[in-house]
Amino acid sequence: MTILNPITFPVILESLLASNDLTEEQSNYLMNSWLDNKIEPVQTGAFLAAFRAKGVSGDELSAMAKILQDASTTPSDLPSFDLVDTCGTGGDGANTFNISTGVAFVSAALGVKIAKHGNRSASGKVGSADVLENLGLPLNVSSGKVVEALKKLGITFLFAPSWHPSLVNLAPLRKSLGVRTIFNLLGPLVNPLRPKSQVLGVAKADLLDPMSVALKGMGLKRAVVVHGAGGLDEASLAGANQFRFLDKDVIRSEIISPGDLGLTQISNESLKGDGLKTNSHILKSLLNGEGNQYHKEVIALNTALVLWVSGTEDDLSSGVKRALDCLDTDKSWLLFEQLRDFLAT
């Protein structure tokens, strides 16, 4: 009887097509082959389609994310303090304003060290990089400058394409496929500054478990994975939000509605953006202590998650209150201006 080598492209593809999860060794081999440009485009298309059909496991994600993170441009002088990232997988199609970007600056204004890892638009009309660039933040800056900003100001922004040069060769094929792939899930997991805590939004409820398992596998101290009411990849004001809380290697599930935290329940329509100009105006207004109440409340809800994962607050209710108080001031906008000016020099 012939025993097939389990670490070959055909065997790996057959395993995926049979809806079997890959071993860690297979996952590592596949990701390293992508990074070394050893997979033909037609094979890559087949693998990405097979993952999409099977559904990805948390162990597959963590194995591949570790390889991808190690291949990123990682500075030698990483900060000694713990960092938090705030991001979502995208794909909700809701076209909300840039909630997680606002959350990053409000959280930093409240003392949390934020390493925001982001890109241009994935599913919405405007990505975090798009809106920040439109407000004057330089994107293509040296890794040293990015880290220096974090140490000086307590917040920085990492423009994903600048930090993951090994993925450039895959970009045209991913775009030509026209569907979301495993790389859309890996992106939020591979912050090169290696935060120890994270708030991560998913657009589909069936991603809650694999993404939380992946974060655990990558050694995070604390994390929140959230699927928002109405299908948002953020905590929403529209109703019951589904959560996975990771704390000390234990993952627990919870459902929290805005009313549980004294917030208004309102449809996601109230959170919609409308292109780059409008989204930029909304974000600037909020950070400047202005903006409408519903926008402030959804920022406060998601900021409370950041305050919890960072250990700044023990409960979400107190985190919401602190965030709302901050949103009545211009502290967050002043911090944005400091970061913008620092990165521009």
From Swiss-Prot:
The keyword Transcription does not apply. It comes from the Bacteria. Mg(2+) 2 binds at residues 233-234. Keywords: Amino-acid biosynthesis, Aromatic amino acid biosynthesis, Glycosyltransferase, Magnesium, Metal-binding, Transferase, Tryptophan biosynthesis. Mg(2+) 1 binds at residues 100, 234. Pfam families: Glycos_trans_3N (PF02885), Glycos_transf_3 (PF00591). One of its GO terms (molecular function) is magnesium ion binding. The keyword Magnesium applies. It is an enzyme of class 2 (transferase). This is Anthranilate phosphoribosyltransferase. It comes from Prochlorococcus marinus (strain NATL2A). The lineage of its organism: Bacteria, Bacillati, Cyanobacteriota, Cyanophyceae, Synechococcales. The gene is trpD.
